[in-house]
Regions:
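Conserved beta-strand segments of alpha/beta enzyme cores
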Residues: 30, 52, 154-156
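Catalytic-site signature of metal-activated, phosphate-bearing donor transferases
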Residues: 66-69, 76, 80, 87-172
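Acidic helix N-cap motif at the loop->helix transition within catalytic regions
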Residues: 17-19, 40-49, 89-90
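A conserved acidic beta->alpha catalytic loop
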Residues: 24, 35-44, 81
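Active-site acidic short loop of glycosyltransferases
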Residues: 2, 27, 51, 72-75, ...
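Conserved donor nucleotide-binding strand/loop of the catalytic core
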Residues: 43-71
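N-proximal low-complexity "stem/linker" segments adjacent to membrane-targeting elements
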Residues: 1-24
Length: 172
């Protein structure tokens, strides 16, 4: 049985990352990708996981993500970046969370990795971000930097983290 959540992902030239991200969410009911006209194999890879791929010229992180959210069709949306992964433990926890009606959104900790090493200090852990929310209660705050989801309702916290693989090399 598929997890009844829509995944919303934005991409631009993410062929190095996107397959691992999509593989980690392949058992979600819906995956929506909004691509900013990638010039690599990103879209080709995405086609192996979803047919819900939309093109939108780059307009900033918040605008791209809001467009992706608007294309989803399920009551719950999870925004995932191309360099992030959802673990089995996180899938189990969020499946349980959405089965009750206590909250309209959830902050999820991010476990950030730099050059393959987990960054535990300097404010990089637990790095809570609001990524899971009821579509009818949340939207992106449109601003230049540090975009975030705004939820009109109660928000809770999840214990299991998203794995975030930032820079794998100094060239990245």
């Amino acid at each position: 049985m598929k997890i009844p959540i829509s995944i919303a992902i934005i991409t631009k030239n993410e062929e190095k990352n996107i397959e691992d991200a999509l593989e980690s969410v392949k058992d979600f009911e819906e995956i929506v990708v909004v691509d900013a006209f990638s010039e690599d194999r990103t879209v080709e890879i995405c086609k192996n996981y979803t047919d819900k791929i939309y093109k939108l010229e780059w307009k900033g992180f918040a605008t791209q993500k809001q467009f992706a959210v608007e294309k989803t069709t399920l009551p719950w949306v999870f925004i995932l970046d191309a360099d992030e992964r959802v673990t089995e433990a996180l899938k189990m926890e969020i499946t349980e969370k959405i089965s009750n009606d206590d909250f309209d959104g959830y902050f999820i900790p991010r476990k950030n990795f730099f050059l393959g090493k987990w960054i535990k200090h300097s404010g990089w852990w637990p790095d809570y971000t609001l990524r899971l929310f009821r579509k009818d209660k949340g939207k992106m705050q449109i601003r230049e930097v540090h975009e975030k989801v705004i939820v009109n309702g109660k928000v809770g916290y999840v214990k299991e983290p998203i794995l975030h693989y930032t820079y794998q090399t100094f060239e990245d």
